[in-house]
Amino acid sequence: MRGFGPGLTARRLLPLRLPPRPPGPRLASGQAAGALERAMDELLRRAVPPTPAYELREKTPAPAEGQCADFVSFYGGLAETAQRAELLGRLARGFGVDHGQVAEQSAGVLHLRQQQREAAVLLQAEDRLRYALVPRYRGLFHHISKLDGGVRFLVQLRADLLEAQALKLVEGPDVREMNGVLKGMLSEWFSSGFLNLERVTWHSPCEVLQKISEAEAVHPVKNWMDMKRRVGPYRRCYFFSHCSTPGEPLVVLHVALTGDISSNIQAIVKEHPPSETEEKNKITAAIFYSISLTQQGLQGVELGTFLIKRVVKELQREFPHLGVFSSLSPIPGFTKWLLGLLNSQTKEHGRNELFTDSECKEISEITGGPINETLKLLLSSSEWVQSEKLVRALQTPLMRLCAWYLYGEKHRGYALNPVANFHLQNGAVLWRINWMADVSLRGITGSCGLMANYRYFLEETGPNSTSYLGSKIIKASEQVLSLVAQFQKNSKL
């Protein structure tokens, strides 16, 4: 099996569920901390295999299984987030690439090129350089993957590493590089050829339904009747499992089968279907309304993209006439971004330049207070949706601002919003922004009740994805572009 390393068979990948560990306090100081750090250094010295000389790379025996098992056991015994972060930081900093070897091999390649030596000599020198660029800890990860449950352990280890980085317990280029190396290895082990597409129905095993319910991160499942609706008529639920662990969800996709592109999430997750028997002639659109990763250690591994592509093919087989594919997506971060803009406007200008004069006047008349402070108070809660006048008054400016947030706000040239970036990378079109599309508490406080449709025109997804990834061009509908133009005209930024 490509990518799993010699000798790794299907039985090696156990279900990717580890018991949760409490984060605990930071690393202790004093004698206890010193003893723990010395134990870490000794463990790493024994567990991380040395890099064999280039000539012996295929003749050196693998390290004893016990050495890798010792690392797994030691790491599993660290209950505190800070302790695990300390060990991972020491691994990244002390067992990466030998920079001296890299410099030496690079000089050798350059020298051979200048001498215009024959291709075979140059290719071998380049292979030596490539070998020198492999960090030592990669060997540790490779050998751990051969242990029973080893890949499961590495998925959890990467989840811990990402958490430690987010908490700033461990930082630096060495740590980022190790994260990238481990992500690359996991991407090979979890590539699409090793993944099974499984559909969930009400007759699926109870433990699968329970896992799907627990994994739902976008629109939480309230009870068993709620779950039954989401896998019942006019609904589909699919997940990827690894070929060695059927029935163990890695990433989950929920789909609504409708007559048009949905604009309200409550109509999907709360309302009962029109009938218990599906009328196929009424199903013309497939709406992807939730996608959830169950393993945080697999962040950045392209499971979601592969899952959508596989589900589209599955739905086309079941409904050959199905022609419309779209998401109904949350807009996480919009309210936070807007509140940040309001705060900066107050500090820099002392007035609101996001809303037109007439909009400011209307909102002030309804609320009876100064526009900036009132808006910050309103948007920090969900109470404003109780006022029909406020809902009407805020619709035009918030739609305009949301369009700009999705289309115009960038991070390194790509969409700032992570959900937008995901669908645009897949080649979807930013199709429509929907007002009062999610009136749940989470929807109102997180994105002012707004949601977006990203539409997948199947024949255009390839060119759109290439255009976005290569030229950073966002394909958007007339509705979105019109709202963006209004923002640029009316908001004095």
From Swiss-Prot:
Outcome after substituting residue 423 to N? 7-fold reduction in catalytic activity
Reaction(s) catalysed by this chain's protein = malonyl-CoA + H(+) = acetyl-CoA + CO2
Q: Where are the stretches annotated Catalytic domain? A: 191-493
Gene Ontology cellular-component annotations: cytoplasm; cytosol; mitochondrial matrix; mitochondrion; peroxisomal matrix; peroxisome
Which residues does this entry mark as bearing N6-acetyllysine? 59, 168, 211, 389, 472
What tissue expression does the UniProt record report for this protein? Expressed in fibroblasts and hepatoblastoma cells (at protein level). Expressed strongly in heart, liver, skeletal muscle, kidney and pancreas. Expressed in myotubes. Expressed weakly in brain, placenta, spleen, thymus, testis, ovary and small intestine.
Q: What is the effect of changing residue 206 to S?
A: Abolishes formation of disulfide-linked homotetramers. Abolishes the cooperative enzyme kinetics that are seen under oxidative conditions
Residue ranges, annotated region (Alpha-helical domain): 40-190
Compartments where located: Cytoplasm; Mitochondrion matrix; Peroxisome; Peroxisome matrix
Is Acetylation set as a keyword in this record? yes
InterPro entries annotated for this entry? Malonyl_CoA_deC, Malonyl_CoA_deC_C, Malonyl_CoA_deC_C_sf, MCD_N, MCD_N_sf
Question: Which residue positions does UniProt flag as site: Essential for catalytic activity?
Answer: 211
The main location is cytoplasm
Effect on the protein of changing residue 243 to S: Does not abolish formation of disulfide-linked homotetramers. No effect on development of cooperative enzyme kinetics in response to oxidative conditions
Its quaternary organisation is:
Homotetramer. Dimer of dimers. The two subunits within a dimer display conformational differences suggesting that at any given moment, only one of the two subunits is competent for malonyl-CoA binding and catalytic activity. Under oxidizing conditions, can form disulfide-linked homotetramers (in vitro). Associates with the peroxisomal targeting signal receptor PEX5.
**Annotated disorder:** Malonyl-CoA decarboxylase deficiency: Autosomal recessive disease characterized by abdominal pain, chronic constipation, episodic vomiting, metabolic acidosis and malonic aciduria.
Protein name (record): Malonyl-CoA decarboxylase, mitochondrial
Q: Which organism is it from?
A: Homo sapiens
Gene name linked to the record: MLYCD
